[in-house]
Amino acid sequence: PYITTNTLTRDCDTGIQNMGVYRTMVRNETSVVCNLTPGRQGYRNTLTWTNKDKVAPIAWAIAAPPAVHLATVAQLPYGVDEITLAGGMMGEAVNVVKCRTVDLLVPADAEIIIEGEIHPGETEMEGPFGEFAGFMGPVERRPVVRITAITHRRNPIYYGYTSQMPPSESTTIQSLTNAGIMLKMLRHDLGEIAVSDVFIDLTFAGMLGHAVIAMKPGYPGHSKKVGRLVAAMSPIKRVTVVDEDIDIRDHTHVEWAMNSRYNPSRDTVLIDDAYFPINMDPSVRS
């Protein structure tokens, strides 16, 4: 059995928390193995403890408010707490409470909270698991978590993300959340007001997926600049930039634009040696 919902960790140096989805294999009644993948924020947070020979705190919030689940899959800059994003979506702060046995804040309205500790050097093989990309995730050595507490409501509701051959629940919420974040970053943070819309396909979604950007270029090469920005800000594998008259959610319309306006030799930009911090894509593993 697996836990497939919100995982919370904390940076030992800054105190900033991270919330993400890291599949977690139930090992026995008192321990699990968490797929904290190198390069992702939960993994980095854990290292800030274990590299100092300290025990790292970790927790799972099962069946939290919907905005919390949406924020969990967001590809946010390192150091930004996803619970803050969830509060923005809700229009009010997320109620949080301190865990009983570890130093973490978790959503108070979650149905179930599982608390645990990661001790330096304790690892075990984890996997395989049917992942959001439609492939079996690989078996690799990952941290063992000693469970320290489980709290829950009376008659709690259990919830987990459904990952299967895409599109799935998992890829759909990744697409919605990360497209919105990408549009906000382009228009408001980077000043690219020529960008009018962003869509991320429902196959690999926010992780290694295909982003389609609609914009009105202001000068020659403007669309290539925006494409590079998108490639740099997230683990997106492909970026297609089209004019704003194209319905980017209509695959046929996008293909029409590609066939009628795209010149491969002139309009293709390849970025060599790009690193994607995820091992669910067979082309990355090969």
Provide a role label for each language-model segment.
Residues 1-61:
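Internal mixed beta-strand/loop scaffold within catalytic domains of large alpha/beta enzymes
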